[in-house]
């Protein structure tokens, strides 16, 4: 159903933003005293499927038209596949724009923070069969960043039916996703099957 607005983290205790029907569902410590940077928007009363989910750090995802999860998206990736550890920015605060009950459209604002970057995001979610999200971000770097990934996606892949010879497992395929479907700005549609090489590769 629709969400009228909620304090999902960051504001001082007592900020009058959480409607009673939502606040009753949250543990007292979470609803009033602690930051909450992971949350789910459910399909409606009596369902167990997610409309969308923010999963901590800068991860977010939606289950799509068939209620099947695959890839997760991230707000930002910093120093992926570098000789030093990757940095994981996180969303620290969320705001939900007021919507009508049972609305298929929701707007969420989020602040991001990390040692290297800070920024603000606007997520415009529309559910009509599948889910489409339009994202606008303003990012401010605190220092030089060797490698920054904008609009990164993440998933899990061991092997698929196309490279079954790489595996020593009885199952025909083991993955959350087996390829990347691209719809370019020029209207071209591309399909890139995933692979599991012995070393990191970029393209």
Short names for language-model regions:
Residues 52-54, 58-71, 146, 150-203:
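A contiguous, surface-exposed recognition patch within enzymatic or periplasmic domains that forms
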Residues 29, 86, 97-100, 124-130, ...:
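A general structural signal for short secondary-structure junctions and capping/turn motifs
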Residues 3-8, 116-119, 189-190:
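Short, surface-exposed beta-strand/loop "edge" segments at domain boundaries and coil↔beta transitions
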Residues 34-36, 91, 103-105, 118-122, ...:
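Extracellular structured ligand-interaction cores
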Residues 110-156:
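Acidic, contiguous internal or C-terminal segments within carbohydrate-active enzymes
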Residues 42, 111-113, 185:
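Structured loops at beta-to-helix junctions and adjacent beta-edge loops in soluble globular domains
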Residues 1-82:
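Solvent-exposed N-terminal domain segments of exported/luminal and surface proteins
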Residues 74-128:
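Extended, loop-rich substrate-binding clefts of extracytoplasmic carbohydrate-active enzymes
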């Amino acid at each position: 159903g629709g969400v009228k607005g909620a304090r999902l983290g960051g504001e001082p205790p007592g900020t009058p933003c959480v409607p009673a029907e939502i606040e009753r569902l949250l543990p007292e410590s979470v609803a009033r005293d602690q930051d909450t940077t992971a949350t789910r928007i459910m399909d409606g009363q009596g369902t167990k499927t997610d409309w969308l989910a923010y999963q901590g750090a800068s991860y977010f995802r939606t289950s799509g038209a068939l209620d099947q999860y695959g890839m997760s998206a991230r707000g930002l990736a910093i120093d992926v596949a570098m000789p030093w550890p990757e940095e994981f920015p996180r969303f620290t605060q969320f705001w939900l724009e007021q919507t009508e009950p049972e609305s298929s459209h929701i707007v969420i604002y989020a602040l991001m923070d990390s040692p290297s970057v800070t920024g603000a995001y606007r997520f415009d979610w529309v559910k009509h069969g599948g889910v489409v999200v339009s994202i606008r971000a303003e990012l401010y770097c605190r220092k030089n960043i060797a490698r920054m990934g904008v609009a990164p996606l993440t998933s899990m892949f061991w092997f698929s039916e196309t490279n079954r010879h790489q595996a020593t497992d009885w199952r025909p395929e083991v993955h959350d996703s087996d390829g990347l479907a691209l719809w370019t700005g020029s209207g071209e549609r591309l399909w890139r099957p995933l692979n599991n090489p012995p070393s990191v590769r970029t393209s």
